[in-house]
C-alpha cells in the first residue's frame, strides 16, 4: 500500500496570509470577508486624507511614495532643457511652489475668463465649448463617464470596424458625480445639493465675482436641467445603446440647438465624417439647452467651472473651498492630502509615461514579468478547458470563444512603446499653464490617432498604476508593474497565495472578455453577435441570477447594491476566480499543495482572494460608489466565493450559515 502524500509546511515570504488581520471568531460561512479581514478592519483607521483605505490604496500610496523619490531626484538633476526628465522635474516643482501659486492669484486664468466674458452669441458659445473639449472620458476601458465640461471626447477603435479610430462624444456638464445627485428627492441628496450651490457661490466670491448667490442659483438650475436629460450610469454602460455613429453633418438635425459646425471646427473635428454619439438622447438634450438657456447663464456657468476645476493650481483659498465640498461633503475625507502627494499625482497624470520609465527602471525586476507571464498562460489554458467542459454551449459558440481567448494580447509591467512628450511645453513656475497645456497635449495626441492604423498594443494605464484593465476593442489586457507586489504577488509565497491574489486579478481581467459587455465583442475587437440564440439566452439567465444575488446586498438601510450596474465586474470576479482555481490546481501537477501558516492549499487560495478585498470606506464615499460605480463594495466581492463548490469543504461551510447556497443556487457563468 503506497503512502499518502502529506502536505509540507513552508514559510511564506514578505506577506503570504495575514493571520493577524483575520477574525477567527467569525464563521467563514456566515461572513467570509469578516473572517478573513475582521482583525484588520478593527485595527485600521482610514488616514485622514483618504476616503477609503485598503489593499489597493495601500499599494497606491507606496507607488506614490516611490514616485516622489524619483521626482525629488529629478528636480536635483541638471537635466537638459526640453528633455523629458527636465519636463517631469519642472512640472513637479511648479506644483510644489505654493508661494508662487498664491502670488500669481487668478492672473494665469484671466485669459480664459476673459474669453468667457466676451461671448456675444450662441455661435461664439459653441466655438468656446468646442475649444474646451478634452479627452477626459473613457466609457469602456476605464468606465469613466464623468466630465464637468458639456461634452467629453474619447478616441478609440470603431466598435463596428476596429481597424480604424473614431471619435466618441459623451454627455457631461455636471459638477456633481451623477444625475441622481440632482434628481433624487431624499433629504440626504437635498442636503448635498444645498451645499453644492453654496460651494458655487463661495468660489465666485473668492474670485470677486459679484452677486455670487444669485449666479450660483442660476448655475445650479442649469446643471439640474442637464441632469434631467442625462442617461443613467447603468444605461451608459450598455455598448449596444452606445454604438451610434452619426455623420458629422447630421448633428444639426439629430441634436438641434448647438451650432455644431462651429463646435466641431473649434474642437478640431471638422474633417471627421463620423462622430459616435454615445448617449444620443443626452447629447440632443444638452444641445437644446445651448439655445434655450440665457447666454448670460452659460457665461456664469463656464466661469465657475473654469475656476473650480483649476482650484488645485490656484491660491490656497480656492483649493480649500473645493476640498471642503468635494473632499469633506461628497467623500467624507476630513483632511486635504499633503501638497507633495497632490504634486506627484498631477505630474503622473500629465507625464505618466515619462514617469513610468523612471519607475520601471527602479522598481520592476525582469524576473517578476516572466513569472507573471507564466501565470497568465496557465490561467488562459484553464479558461480554455472550462470552455471545453461547458455542457450548455454549442460547438460553434465554443470555437468563437476559444478563438477570442487564443488571440488575447497580454501586456505585463509596461508598454513596448512610450508616449513621446517632445510636443509638450512645460514652463517652470507655471503650474496652471502646465496643467492646461498637458490636457491639450493629451487631447491633440488622441486627435492625431484619427486616420492612423490602430495600435493593438497601446496601453491605457501607466506602469505606476495599481490596477489592471481589459481592452475589449483591442482584445488585450494590461497589468501595470505597480500591482505586481504583495499581497497580490509575492515571489516567495506559495502558489496558492499567488494564484488567489494576482491570479484572481488576472482571471478577472481575462473574464472581462466574456462578461455581459465583453462577450459582445469578437476576437477582432468588433461588436458582433457570435452566440447562438440558445447560448445567449442561457448566458443572460446566469447573469440575471448573479445580478439578483447582488441586489440582495444592503450596505445601508436606504441603499442597495445595483446588481445590473455591477454585473460586468461581478461576472469577471466569479468567472476569473473559477478559472484561476482550476489553473492553480493544474499547476500542482498532481501533488498535494503545501501547508502554510497552518492552512491547507485550498484555504490559502481563498484566504488570499478575500485578503485582496480588505477595505474601509467612509460612508459618503461608499454611497457615491454605489450610485456611480460599476464595482460593488469590496466586502461583497470577497463573498463571490460562495458560488464556488470548492470553497464549501475548504472551510466546512454548512447549510444554515448565512452565505450558504444550495448547489442549484450557485451561479455558474463560465
Task: State where each predicted segment sits.
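Boundary at the C-terminal end of the N-terminal hydrophobic targeting segment
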Residues: 3-7
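Short, Gly/Pro- and small/polar-rich lid/capping loops
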Residues: 8-20
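Active-site-surrounding "flap" and adjacent substrate/cofactor-binding loops of secreted or lumenal enzymes
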Residues: 10-11, 26-103
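Hydrophobic/aromatic-rich, well-ordered segments within soluble, folded domains that form packed cores
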Residues: 22-42, 182-204, 393, 567, ...
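Short, solvent-exposed loop/turn and secondary-structure capping segments
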Residues: 43-47, 154-156, 178-180, 230-233, ...
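Short secondary-structure subsegments characteristic of cysteine-rich extracellular domains
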Residues: 49-71, 212-229, 498-504, 602-605
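Noncatalytic, helix-rich "gating/capping" subdomain that lines the substrate-entry/channel surface
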Residues: 74-378
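Intrinsically disordered, low-complexity linker/terminal regions across diverse proteins
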Residues: 225, 254-257, 269, 276-280, ...
Amino acid at each position: 500500500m503506497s503512502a499518502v502524500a502529506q502536505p509540507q509546511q513552508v514559510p511564506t515570504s514578505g506577506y503570504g496570509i495575514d493571520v493577524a488581520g483575520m477574525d477567527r471568531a467569525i464563521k467563514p460561512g456566515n461572513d467570509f470577508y469578516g473572517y478573513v479581514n475582521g482583525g484588520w478592519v478593527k485595527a485600521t483607521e482610514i488616514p485622514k486624507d483618504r476616503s477609503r483605505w485598503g489593499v489597493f490604496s495601500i499599494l497606491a500610496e507606496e507607488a506614490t511614495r516611490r514616485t516622489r523619490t524619483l521626482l525629488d531626484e529629478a528636480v536635483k538633476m541638471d537635466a537638459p532643457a526640453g528633455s523629458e526628465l527636465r519636463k517631469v522635474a519642472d512640472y513637479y516643482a511648479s506644483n510644489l511652489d505654493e508661494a508662487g501659486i498664491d502670488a500669481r492669484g487668478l492672473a494665469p486664468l484671466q485669459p480664459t475668463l476673459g474669453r468667457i466674458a466676451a461671448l456675444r452669441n450662441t455661435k461664439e458659445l459653441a466655438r468656446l465649448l468646442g475649444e474646451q473639449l478634452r479627452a477626459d472620458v473613457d466609457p469602456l476601458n476605464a468606465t469613466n463617464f464623468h466630465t464637468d465640461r458639456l461634452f467629453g471626447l474619447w478616441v478609440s477603435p470603431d466598435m463596428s470596424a476596429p481597424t480604424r479610430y473614431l471619435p466618441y462624444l459623451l454627455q457631461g456638464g455636471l459638477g456633481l458625480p451623477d444625475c441622481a445627485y440632482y434628481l433624487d428627492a431624499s433629504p440626504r441628496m437635498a442636503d448635498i445639493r444645498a451645499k453644492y450651490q453654496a460651494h458655487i457661490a463661495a468660489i465666485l466670491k473668492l474670485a470677486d465675482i459679484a452677486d455670487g448667490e444669485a449666479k450660483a442659483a442660476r448655475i445650479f438650475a442649469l446643471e439640474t436641467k442637464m441632469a434631467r436629460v442625462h442617461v443613467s450610469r447603468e444605461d451608459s454602460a450598455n455598448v449596444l445603446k452606445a454604438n451610434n455613429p452619426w455623420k458629422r453633418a447630421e448633428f444639426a438635425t439629430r441634436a438641434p440647438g448647438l451650432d455644431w459646425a462651429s463646435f466641431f471646427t473649434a474642437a478640431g473635428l471638422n474633417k471627421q465624417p463620423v462622430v459616435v454619439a454615445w448617449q444620443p438622447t443626452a447629447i440632443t438634450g444638452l444641445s437644446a439647452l445651448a439655445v434655450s438657456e440665457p447666454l448670460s447663464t452659460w457665461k456664469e456657468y463656464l466661469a465657475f467651472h473654469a475656476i473650480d476645476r483649476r482650484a488645485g493650481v490656484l491660491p490656497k483659498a480656492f483649493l480649500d473651498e473645493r476640498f471642503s465640498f468635494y473632499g469633506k461633503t461628497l467623500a467624507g475625507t476630513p483632511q486635504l492630502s499633503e501638497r507633495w502627494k497632490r504634486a506627484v499625482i498631477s505630474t503622473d497624470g500629465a507625464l505618466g509615461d515619462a514617469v513610468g520609465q523612471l519607475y520601471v527602471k527602479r522598481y520592476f525586476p525582469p524576473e517578476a514579468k516572466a513569472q507573471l507571464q507564466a501565470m497568465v498562460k496557465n490561467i488562459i489554458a484553464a479558461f480554455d478547458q472550462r470552455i471545453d467542459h461547458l455542457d450548455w454551449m454549442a460547438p460553434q459558440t465554443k470555437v468563437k470563444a476559444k478563438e477570442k481567448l487564443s488571440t488575447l494580447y497580454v501586456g505585463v509591467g509596461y508598454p513596448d512603446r512610450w508616449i513621446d512628450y517632445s510636443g509638450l511645453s512645460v514652463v517652470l513656475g507655471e503650474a496652471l499653464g502646465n496643467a492646461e497645456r498637458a490636457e491639450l497635449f493629451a487631447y491633440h495626441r488622441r486627435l492625431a490617432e484619427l486616420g492612423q492604423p490602430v495600435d493593438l498594443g497601446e496601453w491605457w494605464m501607466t506602469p505606476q498604476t495599481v490596477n489592471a484593465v481589459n481592452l475589449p476593442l483591442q482584445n488585450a489586457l494590461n497589468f501595470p508593474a505597480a500591482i505586481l507586489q504583495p499581497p497580490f504577488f509575492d515571489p516567495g509565497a506559495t502558489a496558492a497565495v499567488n494564484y488567489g491574489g494576482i491570479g484572481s486579478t488576472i482571471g478577472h481581467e481575462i473574464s472581462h472578455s466574456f462578461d455581459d459587455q465583453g462577450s459582445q465583442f469578437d476576437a477582432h475587437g468588433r461588436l458582433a453577435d457570435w452566440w447562438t440564440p440558445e447560448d445567449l439566452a442561457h448566458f443572460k439567465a446566469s447573469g440575471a441570477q448573479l445580478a439578483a444575488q447582488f441586489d440582495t446586498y444592503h450596505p445601508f438601510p436606504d441603499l442597495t447594491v445595483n446588481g445590473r450596474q455591477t454585473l460586468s465586474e461581478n461576472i469577471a470576479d466569479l468567472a476569473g476566480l473559477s478559472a484561476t482555481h482550476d489553473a492553480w490546481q493544474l499547476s500542482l501537477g498532481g501533488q498535494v499543495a503545501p501547508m502554510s501558516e497552518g492552512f491547507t492549499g485550498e484555504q490559502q487560495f481563498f484566504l488570499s482572494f478575500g485578503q485582496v478585498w480588505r477595505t474601509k470606506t467612509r460612508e459618503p464615499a461608499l454611497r457615491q460608489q454605489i450610485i456611480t460605480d460599476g464595482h460593488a463594495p469590496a466586502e461583497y466581492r470577497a463573498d463571490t466565493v460562495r458560488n464556488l463548490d470548492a470553497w464549501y469543504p475548504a472551510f466546512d461551510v454548512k447549510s444554515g450559515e448565512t452565505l450558504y447556497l444550495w448547489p442549484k443556487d450557485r451561479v455558474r457563468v463560465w
